[in-house]
Design a protein with these regions (language model features):
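ABC-type nucleotide-binding domain
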Residues: 1-244
Length: 244
């Protein structure tokens, strides 16, 4: 991503000259305040939108020069607004790789925590998810989305971590899945959880104006005592809160 500028409305720029280099096989976490363009960056990589200026490249090729089929073969998406079709749970996972074996399906289900969902549902794998996946909770829908990414085995995975609090079981499964994805693919995560941020090889800190404020490892950014350290201290403090 080089000198990328983007706005949904011309009078309100979202990204202002963003540079982002993601080495193959690495994990990059993007953090920053709400509305700074973190999720927008993922959507530009996936070409949900085209940049206003600059370029997004994968392997040196501008995504605008890639066919939709080629781009989708290279990239998997795990976004917060997971959409499931009114089809069976099995087919909603298999859509990522229709030729996958039963063994492969069950392996990714175990990794993503979908097996627990299957066991809870009366119809198991053949349960209809309902339009938009309304038969499942938000955390369960994200598990299905992660299972899709694991089954697809795309070289690049874009993951927009849920901002809402997940129960302990969902949280554990998401972290475990991120660890697996990190071993298999180049992983770009919009991160909100401290544990996820610490897993990254590189952390990109966005400021409220849509610019990159800081870049580095966790230890490097803590030593800078800048925006990332403020972010870390506030999140760390809030994680210690208890109701009494």
């Amino acid at each position: 991503m080089g000198e990328v500028r983007f706005s949904y409305m011309k009078e309100k720029p979202i990204l202002r000259g963003v540079d982002l280099d993601v080495p193959e096989g690495s994990m990059v976490a993007i953090v920053g305040p709400s509305g700074c363009g973190k999720t927008t960056m993922l959507k530009l990589i996936a070409r949900f939108y085209d940049v206003d200026d600059g370029a997004v490249r994968i392997g040196g090729v501008d995504v605008r020069d890639m066919t939709t089929e080629d781009l989708f073969a290279r990239v998997s998406f795990v976004f917060q607004d997971v959409y499931l079709f009114n089809d069976t749970l099995r087919n909603n996972v298999l859509m990522a790789n229709p030729d996958a074996s039963e063994e492969q399906l069950r392996a990714v289900a175990d990794l993503a925590g979908v097996t627990e969902v299957v066991e809870r549902l009366p119809g198991g794998w053949e349960t209809l998810c309902g339009e938009g996946g309304r038969s499942l909770s938000g955390g369960e829908r994200q598990r299905v989305s992660i299972a899709r990414a694991l089954l697809k085995q795309a070289p690049i995975v874009l993951l927009d971590e849920a901002t809402s609090a997940l129960d302990a079981e969902n949280e554990k499964n998401v972290v475990r899945s991120i660890e697996t994805l990190k071993r298999r693919s180049t992983l770009i995560v919009v991160a909100h959880k401290l544990e996820t941020v610490r897993m990254a090889d590189k952390i990109v800190v966005m400021d409220s104006s849509g610019k990159v404020a800081e870049t580095g490892t966790h230890n490097e950014l803590i030593a800078l005592e800048g925006e990332y350290k403020d972010f870390w201290d506030k999140r760390n403090a809030s994680s210690q809160w208890q109701l009494v």
